[in-house]
């Protein structure tokens, strides 16, 4: 082999890892299949792939909910993105509530990337039960799901509104809510997906449901933000339904490099309008929500927000 042949072979060998490394893979931990947040994860993965010409590939992982997502952030490698209400991250970092015996210094390395549609509490009852308020849920079989923030929030509301030990809690996965409702295994279920939630659409179309509204007094008692699900959002829903909502953020950790965090954040915002054209829940996500993020933002995402002049919260840096 001549000198030039050897040089050409060496050059090709050097190029191979470069082309292979051009594709960055990111794990995106969302929620249970069939939920709003799982569908959002699918949309984000497609948007990031399209917006980066395939240079960043998001692999979507199903999850039992936000508590599991936060726990896994302490043990997963750098390119790991997960969704959670920021309140849960604060609890993890403080070693409180469900994280009391699971404190981990890695929780302090969690950083925000961008907001996604807010949690929307849905208390869904089979229409033929005749239940139209929380008092009517007494003696009924209700599915809360397992391990998710929505399940914990739902249980808190039931206790708060006088239903502690007065409803039967079904031991069924939330992903099976539609089937369980249809076959009479449960009378209702609680889900925290953004509206229009796919599992509520399925239940409303297949069985007929009533979404239980919260009064202004009940909403004030929860200390959450009031949100109104407009009439006509679901089949058979003839009136607006008042409920509560809670912000949700896509997080990563300091193990993700700045360039990847920058590219993810930039592409998310550039693709958001297209996503909103496909799914209405993205229309409510705006740059103004970034200022409400209570914790630190990843330096790569910060770079993008500073370039665009987006207002930031006091703790962002």
Give residue spans per PLM region.
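Acidic, polar ligand-binding/catalytic clefts
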Residues: 80-117
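A bilobed periplasmic-binding-protein/Venus flytrap-type ligand-binding module shared by bacterial periplasmic
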Residues: 116-131, 226, 246-260
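Bilobed "Venus flytrap"/periplasmic-binding protein-like clamshell domains
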Residues: 25-51, 56, 115-183, 287, ...
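Bacterial N-terminal signal peptides that target proteins for export
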Residues: 1-9
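N-terminal (or domain-start) structured segment
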Residues: 23-91
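An extracytoplasmic/periplasmic, membrane-proximal ligand-sensing/linker region
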Residues: 172, 176, 182-183, 193-206, ...
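Sec/Tat signal peptide C-region and signal peptidase I cleavage site
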Residues: 16-22
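Pocket-lining segment of extracytoplasmic ligand-binding domains
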Residues: 85-86, 94-97, 102-103, 165-255
């Amino acid at each position: 082999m001549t000198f030039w042949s050897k040089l050409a072979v060496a050059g090709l060998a050097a190029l191979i890892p470069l082309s292979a490394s051009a594709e960055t893979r990111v794990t995106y931990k969302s929620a249970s299949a069939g939920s709003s947040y799982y569908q959002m994860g699918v949309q984000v993965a497609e948007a990031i792939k399209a917006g980066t010409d395939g240079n960043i590939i998001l692999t979507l992982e199903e999850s039992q909910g936000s508590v599991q997502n936060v726990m896994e952030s302490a043990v997963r490698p750098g390119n790991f993105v997960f969704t959670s209400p920021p309140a849960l991250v604060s609890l993890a970092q403080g070693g409180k509530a469900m994280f009391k015996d699971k404190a981990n210094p890695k929780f302090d390395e969690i950083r925000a990337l961008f907001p996604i549609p807010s949690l929307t509490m849905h208390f869904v009852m089979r229409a033929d039960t005749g239940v139209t308020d929380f008092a009517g849920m007494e003696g009924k079989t209700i599915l809360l799901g397992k391990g998710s923030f929505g399940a914990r929030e739902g249980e808190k509301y039931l206790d708060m509104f006088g239903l502690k030990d007065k409803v039967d809690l079904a031991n069924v996965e939330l992903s099976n809510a539609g089937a369980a409702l249809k076959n009479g295994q449960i009378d209702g279920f609680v889900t925290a997906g953004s509206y229009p939630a796919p599992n509520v659409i399925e239940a409303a179309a297949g069985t007929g449901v009533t979404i239980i509204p919260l009064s202004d007094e009940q909403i004030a008692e929860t200390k959450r933000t009031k949100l109104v699900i407009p009439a006509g959002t679901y089949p058979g829903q003839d009136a607006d339904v008042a409920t509560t909502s809670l912000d949700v953020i896509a997080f990563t950790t300091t193990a993700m490099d700045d360039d990847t965090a920058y590219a993810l954040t930039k592409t998310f915002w550039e693709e958001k309008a297209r996503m909103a054209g496909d799914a209405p829940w993205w229309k409510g996500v705006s740059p103004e929500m970034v200022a409400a993020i209570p914790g630190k933002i990843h330096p790569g995402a910060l770079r993008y927000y500073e370039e665009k002049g987006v207002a930031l919260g006091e703790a962002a840096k």
